[in-house]
A protein has these predicted regions:
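Positively charged, polar, low-complexity stretches
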Residues: 1-89
Length: 89
């Protein structure tokens, strides 16, 4: 499945995790933090493509947290062959 996360609609950490939960249909136990996101993404059993659009806006809004998100997404992608992540400015 293909999912798109629009970085221009994310203005805070809380909004980011809410958008990720809704976009990816994450489980109820999702802890709304990067460690929980990693756990969910590395546990995917079906192929998932996640495209983050307006990444520059996401970085502007979240600063260093956006960089931490990028690391989590890349690490999750390396760990789980069912996950593909792309970023678009």
């Amino acid at each position: 499945m293909r999912f798109v996360l629009d970085g221009s609609s994310v203005g805070s950490r809380e909004a980011l995790h809410r958008a990720l939960r809704e976009t990816l249909s994450l489980p109820e136990w999702y802890g709304k933090n990067l460690d929980a996101l990693y756990d969910c993404l590395t546990d995917l059993r079906e192929p998932v493509e996640l495209e983050v659009t307006n990444a520059a806006k996401l970085c502007e809004s979240l600063g260093g947290y956006a960089l931490a998100l990028l690391h989590v997404l890349r690490d999750s992608e390396r760990e789980n062959e069912n996950l593909t992540v792309s970023w678009q400015e």
